[in-house]
Amino acid sequence: MLQRSAPSTIPNTLARRIFMQRQGLLAPPTPKQTKADLQRLIEQLGFVQIDSIATVERAHHMTLFARNQTYQRRHLTDLLENDRALFENWTHDASMIPTAFYPYWQRHFQRHAEHLRTRWQKIRREGFDAMLDDVLGHIERDGPVMSRSFARDEKKGS
């Protein structure tokens, strides 16, 4: 018979310190954050939630700035759009996730594919399958693209 050991405990101060370190909030200030530094930070975090509302500033910029005050937006844009070191998907909300983690997301994509297709068919109604086929055909022909590579004449929310 297996013996159960008592659960490990650590003091609250150590638990807080571990949490803060894993969230990138204990690192000393650096002279200047490079694009590679930013990529390592996002990999450490696992993802950065995207916020499209900018009351003061979009939250993902504030999240990254809080971890390094030399954060530069252009590095995030480069990582996402030019280097393709990040991809957008839903964690619990829209997020930027390191492309290095993409293989770990494959099972999630497969598990939810049919549910998402059915949901989008209900939302988009007539023409959804043809639109999806067009998008997939475009990607097969031209490789990975951003959403802005597609029609701009469609109203948002339609």
Where are these regions (language model features)?
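Phosphate-backbone binding and catalysis cores of DNA-processing enzymes
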Residues: 2-158
